[in-house]
Curated annotation (Swiss-Prot):
PANTHER family reported for this sequence: DUAL SPECIFICITY PHOSPHATASE CATALYTIC DOMAIN PROTEIN (AFU_ORTHOLOGUE AFUA_1G03540), MRNA-CAPPING ENZYME
CDD domains in UniProt: Adenylation_mRNA_capping (cd07895)
Name of the top EC class for this enzyme: transferase
Lineage: Viruses, Varidnaviria, Bamfordvirae, Nucleocytoviricota, Megaviricetes
Needed cofactors: Mg(2+); Mn(2+)
One of the GO biological process terms: 7-methylguanosine mRNA capping
GO molecular function, one term: GTP binding
Function text: mRNA capping. Transfers a GMP cap onto the end of mRNA that terminates with a 5'-diphosphate tail.
UniProt similarity note: Belongs to the eukaryotic GTase family.
KW ATP-binding (keyword) present: no
Name recorded for this polypeptide: mRNA-capping enzyme
Length: 330
């Protein structure tokens, strides 16, 4: 059944949409047609991203390897929990004269997120990096902000992390959640890597609030980098390593993107039948890849480098305790 089309204003066209995460559903309006194209183009322009195709103006982490340990010791890094949610850019802008708060996923799908008390200054153009996740205690959606690209029309992406975070929080100083809001707005807490005991205590608290699947380790001094960032790391427990494959045929053949060949190439097969062209997240168990969930928020498979690095991560099996114990002497 085709969702009904709703006209929310002069020219902004949306469709009703439902996102399901960790068993909880959130009803949103998905922006479609020219309205969607306009918002994506505005974000690309505001972020000053000269990439050929639209993409999220933020970094993609790489899985950490033992060879990266020395880099962590020689540079300043902060750590936080890796929430198991959906990555979005939160984009405040004006469309056809209307002030809108939108969230945009990796597939360039745009949703309206209608908070009630957004400070007007943000609509000069603001791009915040964050994740939609579920507060398992309150059984509500939370949008966790962890970085900023543009704040109230001012580009902050070249600043260090502390300055970007300060600018973002200051711009939201007057914001207050109300019961009608679709999600709770929160900030990610970054902790210096040289404080392993504090990090472990924080992770215990975070695990009691959110579904988490490891760590994010971010450079303090580095600016925002669009695309893959080899100085931004993620660490997942051995049982949580996953790859996003593309279904290459309905019999379950799965593939990755090979940049040298500029096409998807098969690397295995799943049991069962699937929709050709869809993206599926799979975990590795008992020597084979197993289906976990569909990824409608993505429109392309992981590339060969990600695939090969994930296989190395599975082999190295680095644990969170092993990583944090490197800094015990501190």
């Amino acid at each position: 059944m085709v969702p009904p089309t709703i006209n929310t204003g002069k020219n902004i066209t949306t469709e009703r949409a439902v996102l399901t995460l960790n068993g909880l559903q959130i009803k949103l309006h998905k922006v479609v047609g020219e309205s969607r194209d306009d918002i994506v183009a505005k974000m690309k322009d505001l972020a000053m991203d000269d990439h050929k195709f639209p993409r999220l103006p933020g970094p993609n982490p790489v899985s950490i390897e033992r060879k990266d340990f020395e880099k962590l010791k020689q540079n300043k890094y902060v750590v936080s929990e890796k929430t198991d949610g959906i990555r979005f850019m939160m984009f405040f802008t004006r469309v056809f004269g209307f002030k809108v708060c939108t969230i945009i996923d990796r597939a360039m799908t745009v949703y309206l997120l209608p908070f009630k008390n957004i400070p007007r200054v943000l609509f000069q153009g603001s791009i915040f990096d964050g994740e939609l996740c579920v507060d398992i205690v309150e059984k509500k959606f939370a949008f966790v902000l962890f970085d900023a690209v543009v704040v109230s029309g001012v580009t902050v992406s070249q600043m260090d992390l502390a300055s970007r975070f300060f600018a973002m929080k200051r711009s939201l100083k007057e914001f207050k959640n109300v019961p009608e809001d679709p999600a709770i707005l929160r900030y990610k807490e970054w902790i210096p890597l040289e404080h392993p005991t504090i990090i472990k205590d924080h992770l215990k608290k975070a695990n009691a609030i959110y579904h988490t699947d490891g760590l994010i380790i971010m450079s303090v001094d580095e600016p925002v980098i669009y695309g893959r960032n080899f100085n931004l790391f993620k660490l997942k427990p051995g049982t949580h390593h996953t790859i996003d494959f593309i279904i290459m045929s309905e019999d379950g053949t799965i593939g990755i993107f090979d940049p040298n060949l500029r096409k998807n190439v098969p690397v295995g097969k799943l049991d069962g039948y699937y929709n050709k062209g869809s993206i599926v997240e799979c975990g590795f168990a008992d020597g084979t890849w197993k289906y976990i969930q569909g990824r409608s928020d993505k429109n392309q498979a992981n590339d060969r480098l990600t695939y090969e690095k994930t296989l190395l991560n599975i082999e190295e099996n680095i644990t969170i305790d092993e990583l944090l114990d490197l800094f015990k002497w501190e």
